[in-house]
Amino acid sequence: MTTAVRGLLLALAFLTRLPVWWLGPPRREDHAASLPAYPVVGLILGILLLALYALLQWFFPDQFVVQAALLVAAWALVTGLLHLDGLGDSADAWLGGHGDRLRSLEIMKDPRSGPAAVAVITLALVVKVAALAALLRLDAALAALLIAPVLGRAAAALLIAGTPYARKQGLAGPLAEAPATRWIGLTALGALLFVTALAGWAGLAAVLGVVAVGVWAQHLMMRRLDGFTGDTAGALVEVAELAALLGLLAVLANSAG
């Protein structure tokens, strides 16, 4: 089994709850190879969501809100709620940390969810369902369900590769210690070409939205934590997916009008 394949399997095991056949413990080079595979995991997730969408069209024709709600639910469940959990933990840390680095890191380790987590997760899900429903109504399911997962995970890979790890040890520690390779940049370029080829100007708007929130999120992480954590990387996936959906919608809704 090649290192690239092992890296893809490791990325699938880490980012989803899909049953992944795995042989032996991951090696250091597997962690390095897993980062460029993040957008590929997003593509696999998108294909699964498209298959579900085809089924939902049969049972709930033209019920765009119902379709979007069930798609978002499946989206979250396939990822094991990992990224939503990171979003909630990050929200609690930013509200309860009061600007203190150590306090913020401590809050993120607390398994309990505070009011900020509940509010932010709820808002994120509502916006995601609304944006996806609008895109389904515009017959843009292919673009929405492929582009958002790909760009969300590309953003996380670039964050991890280009940002220090804020903890001495943690779930994302092996990734942070893995050497960044040229393949991450090539993967990001591949994601850009894929998105623009699939959706044109709307895809470019999605990319620009993700780049904007990625730069902003990294700035916040460096200022508060001096780096990223697994939770903040997961939060970025969720926010980047929202940015991608809204970027697509902004262009497609206006062009349809």
UniProtKB/Swiss-Prot annotation:
Q: Which residue ranges does UniProt annotate as crossing the membrane?
A: 4-24, 40-60, 64-84, 116-136, 140-160, 193-213
Record pathway: Cofactor biosynthesis; adenosylcobalamin biosynthesis; adenosylcobalamin from cob(II)yrinate a,c-diamide: step 7/7
Enzyme Commission no: 2.7.8.26
- Which Cys residues form disulphide pairs? none
Required co-factor(s) are: Mg(2+)
One Gene Ontology BP term is:
cobalamin biosynthetic process
Presence of keyword Nucleus = no
What membrane topology does this protein have?
A: Multi-pass membrane protein
Q: Could you confirm whether the keyword Cell cycle appears in this record?
A: no
UniProt cross-references to NCBIfam families, sorted A to Z: cobS, PRK00235.1-5
GO MF terms, alphabetically ordered: adenosylcobinamide-GDP ribazoletransferase activity; cobalamin 5'-phosphate synthase activity
Keywords associated with the record: Cell inner membrane, Cell membrane, Cobalamin biosynthesis, Magnesium, Membrane, Transferase, Transmembrane, Transmembrane helix
Catalysed reaction(s)?
alpha-ribazole + adenosylcob(III)inamide-GDP = adenosylcob(III)alamin + GMP + H(+); alpha-ribazole 5'-phosphate + adenosylcob(III)inamide-GDP = adenosylcob(III)alamin 5'-phosphate + GMP + H(+)
Taxonomic path: Bacteria, Pseudomonadati, Pseudomonadota, Gammaproteobacteria, Chromatiales
> What Pfam families does this protein's entry cite?
CobS
Coiled-coil region(s) at which residues?
none
Protein function:
Joins adenosylcobinamide-GDP and alpha-ribazole to generate adenosylcobalamin (Ado-cobalamin). Also synthesizes adenosylcobalamin 5'-phosphate from adenosylcobinamide-GDP and alpha-ribazole 5'-phosphate.
UniProt xrefs under InterPro entries: CobS
Q: Where is the protein localized?
A: Cell inner membrane
The record's section on PANTHER family has:
ADENOSYLCOBINAMIDE-GDP RIBAZOLETRANSFERASE
What family does this chain come from, according to its entry? Belongs to the CobS family.
Question: What's the protein called, per UniProt?
Answer: Adenosylcobinamide-GDP ribazoletransferase
